[in-house]
Amino acid sequence: MFKDKVLLITGGTGSFGSTLLRKFANSDLKEIRVFSRDEKKQEDLRIELKNDKINFIIGDVRDFHSINTAMEGVDYVFNAAALKQVPSCEFYPMQAIQTNILGSENVLEAAVHNRVKRVVVLSTDKAVYPINTMGMTKSLLEKLCINKARMPQVKENGGVFCCTRYGNVMCSRGSIIPLFISQIKSGQPLTVTEPNMTRFMMSLDDSVRLVMYAFKHAHPGDIFVQKAPAATVETLAIALKELFNANNEIKIIGARHGEKMYESLCGKEEMSKAEDLGDFYRIPADFRDLNYTKYLATDPPRLQDKEYNSDNTRRLNVAQLKELLLTLPYVQEELNSIHH
């Protein structure tokens, strides 16, 4: 499927993008294009990977010309460029709109223009019943992707545009695990926003598995969700304290801007039509048009009153969470650095 193809990763130097890049570095792709704004991160990856197949392109998804040029001759696109920190998006909503909505529209439009065969865009659990700017922008990104998937020229070209939605990615940049570990190492209290707040626990490898599954199995306009266990923030703090044999106090600081008590990966309305694929849910796009009368005779899916969220998924206790944390390279490295 990838032999002699050209792949473009937007946001290719971020936590997810660089994980995906390392996965593909030794594949039989003809070329991998990394499109991002940060020349320092690009240089670091260039030195680390030393791979002639990887082409680093400086550019911003907000600039249609630069992304359109970068997409010439591309077969597949993974769109991982985003502003993803919830509090900073709350303070700078227009910046989030420009990158996550307008920038993503540029990526999708360039993909249509360049007749790209497969596009996978990355969304988040925060896009379901969104209450914060980041979630709202990602929710609209999903709508833009589905809109492109139904375009006649995309269908004629055999193009598949789809979305993946994932929960809290453990150890990604700016997330809670690196924060707690840094607080443990410097002897500070662990700042817990709300002890009973639950979050899905996914590794970076899980998120790559999700996009690869979507890439292989998606129909146009699909949204894919990976099932994942969850834990409370307090359980996470206790598990890390035990792993690092630390006695830092836990300090409750209250929810930050735009935070929810739990996150939803699949809304009630979506669960009524979602297909359970074992480890994943597939949410098919609604391709009805605005002439609703012709659909009245069909058998409609009944709406459900149960969503799939971090409150009703499998809940990890401290022992189970410690076991999961020990599988993460970042946690292993941090533990080793302390023991040396």
PLM regions with names:
Residues K5-S27:
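N-terminal Rossmann NAD(P)H-binding glycine-rich loop of SDR-like oxidoreductase domains
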Residues T10, M71-A80, V121:
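Rossmann-fold scaffold of SDR-type NAD(P)-dependent oxidoreductases
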Residues D28-K41:
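Conserved glycine-rich Rossmann-like NAD(P)H-binding loop of the short-chain dehydrogenase/reductase
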Residues S36, I57-I58, Q98, E194, ...:
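Conserved residues in the N-terminal Rossmann fold of short-chain dehydrogenase/reductase
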Residues N55-Y76:
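Conserved Rossmann-fold cofactor-binding substructure of NAD(P)-dependent oxidoreductases
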Residues F56, A96, V119, F161-T164:
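Hydrophobic/aromatic anchor residues within beta-strands of the central parallel beta-sheet
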Residues N79, L83-S139, N147:
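Conserved Rossmann-fold NAD(P)-dependent oxidoreductase catalytic core, especially the SDR/UDP-sugar
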Residues H113, K143, N147-H340:
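Strand-loop microenvironment adjacent to phosphate/nucleotide-handling motifs in alpha/beta enzyme folds
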